[in-house]
Amino acid sequence: MRSALLVAVAGLAAACGTTGGDNAATAPAKSPKKQRGCPSALVRVAVMNGDTHRPVKNATVGIGRAVHRTNVRGFVWHRLKCRRSVPVRVSAKGYLGKVARPPFKQRRRVVVRVYRKALQWTMYGATPERTQAHEHIAIRPPFRVAWSRGLGSLIEFPAVVSEGYAYIGNMYGAIRALRMRDGKVAWRRNLRQKMASSLAIHGDKLVVHTMRGRVWVLKRSNGKVLWSKYVGSPIESSPIVRYGIDYFGTHNGRVYALDLERRRFRWVRGGNCKITSSVAISGRTLFLGDYCGRVLALNGRSGRTIWVRGVNGRVYGTPAVLGPRLFVPSSTGGSLTAFSTRGRYLWRVNTGSYVYSSPAAWGGRVFFGSYNGRMYAVGASSGRVLWTVRTGGRISGAVVVVSGVAYAGTRRRIVGADARSGRVLLRFPHGDYVPVSGNGRRLLLHGFSRIWAVDPKRRR
């Protein structure tokens, strides 16, 4: 009887414990502990221009379902229900979009850097027309060296640059991603195949051509090989990607249009003359030269020949298009020849020595170098030589124009001259092939096997 009474009392106590007013608060006792484990937080996101370090106002910032606009200081504030890393989507007019995962758990105030599209250098020649001229970067001599990095062996073609990183390969196919801020190597990928061309940036991918006749596509963030395609002949032509199609020529004389999404050829144009020239694009027309001394104009969609014209020798370098004119270098002809983009002959400048240099076209002028050691400035419409500058050695690579300064590279020297007057503004004690690339923050000067990142010197 006594034991039964104790059981009944215990049962009544248990029932009261689950329903009684004083004890009801103990049921959700664990819930506040969960909140303490992931508390809410007011966080600040600052959107900055990655090249200039200036705030980006009126940028759209998406955090979860919420959408904000940055103020004049580039800030947005947002209350997170749970303080943890979440995707932040940033877009702004003229800038490359970005998705980041800032460490909100560690910091309440974070910075997301975005980059103006016009200040990147995503292909050899700077533009689809291969003008070798960057009109938006405003960096001029005198310079100070910010950092330098050895690359192990010959670098014949320049780095491409996007979103704070430079991508460059050496002669033996070792590709590096270098942080523009300090030159730190972000990753390295050794393809173990010789290279004689620049890379091209296509979204989050890198397109690479090698002398073993293979096209490689790498993941830009870590250098992982995504896929490759064999074409059967060495590729010295630097890639150019338009609407997802990579256009290039090969040593066996063929021209390819490779669809990078479908991983198959859109078309292939046969030929029997060696091609080292890269493709220049204007509108829907492709332009390139070959070792038979011809310049070809092809339809980009079909590969159909639009017209063919001859110059006075082999075409090693890459043509440049400026408006309605096409400028074609000839190595063995020692000349630069101008045509209209419809194929009409306009003029020719003879130098008396090899012209391997690809021309730069800017401001109504054309700039190129010769094995005679001179850099030339020529009127684009008249063909009249406006000035020449002695560089002290043979010029093999392209002339490049940035912010009104024309640069040419020779053995152990880069010379920069005012594009209007020809006055020499820079004599840098390193150089070899193509001298310059860069972004809106700094320029990269290219030597034989090392690059130097330079900033403008502050004038006192």
Q: Where are the regions a protein language model picked out?
A:
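Beta-strand-rich domain onsets/edges
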Residues: 17-42, 48-50, 108-115
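Repeat-blade elements of multi-bladed beta-propeller folds
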Residues: 45, 61, 65, 120-128, ...
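Short, acidic Ser/Thr/Gly-rich low-complexity loop/linker segments typical of extracellular
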Residues: 55, 62-77
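Short Pro-Gly-centered beta-turn/loop motif in secreted/extracellular proteins
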Residues: 75-87
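A short, solvent-exposed loop/turn motif at the edges and junctions
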Residues: 85, 89-105
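Blade/loop signatures of beta-propeller domains
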Residues: 117-145
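A short beta-strand motif characteristic of beta-propeller blades
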Residues: 145-149, 184-189, 224-229, 264-269, ...
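Short loop/turn segments that connect beta-strands within beta-propeller blades
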Residues: 179-183, 219-223, 259-263, 299-303, ...
